């Protein structure tokens, strides 16, 4: 379409290795005959002859040609072709069609993920950001949204073509098994969830923060910050935690997780003047912890803190947020 003029091809090797490399046996043939009888009522002699000849051969006589996985290809070009390699086995091509066409899913996810990478790369350049952070600026929390373990592995692996950040363990396993991927395949950080924060009680949220910081004294740690009241945490809560955050050898990443992401992060113009809601997360944290100035004159938050937003995100919304950040004089590297 007008927006996606090319596709990033990915996923073929998984289907070839998982489904088409196993030797074809008599057991496979009998299973096929059984399903044929169930669905169509009988197995014609010509079908039985074809399948028996395939069992005798023992493998799929097919040649699959494809562009290199990970390649971006202009739309309306062939991504792969399948032909038979032995006379009389022309019909095998049609038998694997449905299986191999499932690369539409992995290719679609890889393409979408690549568009996000290109978006963050462009805004990083425009705002003087940190290129080394880009592989972590789009993080895969999609495991729970997938319909199966296989879907999670394949979709998550497609994301890893472009980024390193993931919480989808099956994707890391699949990348190693089917693509011989070398470390680092996918990375993440210690992070809290709402149940953890609730376990300290309504008035124990600061204690929950301190507990997370104590258990993770170094490196990056992400803490969900809207369990009760995001704005309380970012104002009075941060005042209580400020010295501990600054003294820590690492970065505390605040995670808002509800509301309109654009307004939460960049400020709600409808909120009362001077209110935390009007300022938004970035401006509050900039005032509390200070900023550095990038080569383009944009503001980059103190390296001791960061912001991640993982709810209700999609390309157009992310694009709007990055544009608003630019208009506010904020560097794109402030956001994961």
Which functions belong to the PLM regions below?
Residues 1, 67-69:
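A structural micro-motif recognizing beta-strand termini
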Residues 1-43:
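Low-complexity, highly charged intrinsically disordered N-terminal segments
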Residues 43-49:
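N-terminal active-site wall of soluble small-molecule enzyme domains
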Residues 52-61, 70-74, 79-295, 314-317:
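Buried, small/hydrophobic-residue-enriched core segments of structured protein domains
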Residues 67, 307-315:
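Glycine-rich beta-to-alpha transition loops that act as phosphate-gripper elements at the mouths
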Residues 303, 309-311, 332:
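Active-site-proximal binding-pocket segments
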Residues 313-327:
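Catalytic cores of alpha/beta
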Residues 328-336:
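Glycine-rich phosphate-binding active-site loops on the catalytic face of alpha/beta enzymes
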